[in-house]
């Protein structure tokens, strides 16, 4: 219990496990609140299988506004970019940027999620569980070796109903990372299992799950499993969700969501039951002992490429089984998007013609398609007005209202609500102050001069600038930082004293009372 807030962790954690363990980039367990924390801890695991979370391994509390930038690699049974196994009521505004690679060298069933690997792993007292405004941009993959099966989702690996958990919602979450695995793969959720048996008895509690406003633009690649293992060798993947198994009374409701990611079969061999759905791979409804489950898919669009070599391939749902299933408002006949293996993005009109020399909005992101029909990526370029500069990121998405690291120029910039680059501007986010210099680069990691050529400031490692009063310059001399980050020069006062600061570099010279 308790709270952990506003902390950053760096480093590398190498684990040679001899037994099952829980490992977190920040904490093993959380029963309180983890908020505004960052992990840059790389986790490498060998030996026995373990459960890993980029922030926390086991969570029964609240996790908010946390970011994981560390990579996770090794022999891992459950791996989540933020949480390994979740039983908490709220996970919100979390971001995973770290890559996850699982070595599935045996017959185990692995669970991998960009945000949460296993959601619903505890008998919860709460009746509602919410995952809100979370994003994964890390690439998730399993190695080719071994006979294991993977449940991999861009946001959630496996969503299960257990105990008294009655309502779960995943709202406004998105995955832009690429997913590659053998087994079940879904752009948002890999596997939904509601009505799970415990000690051979059906869970009696009715349960509902809602997915609303979620989006996948990551490329999904399905690999066939080794025929010598205990699992079927088929490839199973869906743009939003993979497979489902629902037997308890209640409703699964997936709505207002979309996929623009491409779905590919790896290699040239096609299995008899390979199944791909642009929205979902398979819906299975299994009424049990008088239960009445319902499954609705509403207003969900697939705009991405679907590999038609699969035995069962659909723009919407690859396969379904059972009653009380409705798919409505999901027909789509507009622009289509295809991402090549090297990340090159193409867009096509409904008639198959390439889109060129044009900005295009896919419902979530804006792209610019060049004369050769490929999307501009990692490029600072002029807006059509010829005045403002915009940025298309490594996924081809125009950036709005956000700080963004631009690999092509090697620095972090800020883009406003219209996508325009900030240059020579001081900006405020919460209690933090930032300065974007004349080139648009965020000042960080040391002293800098403002574009006016006169004033100095100090940028911290995280890009915030000192704006909190008294401090020191590089020579150990006392200086004063104004609210806007500029080092004070000349005469300043706090109402009780006047302070004389050097007119050139701002170092402290002396003081005298205001009353003199």
Regions found by a protein language model. Give the residues of each.
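Extracellular adhesion/carbohydrate-binding repeat motifs centered on closely spaced tryptophans
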Residues: 334-516
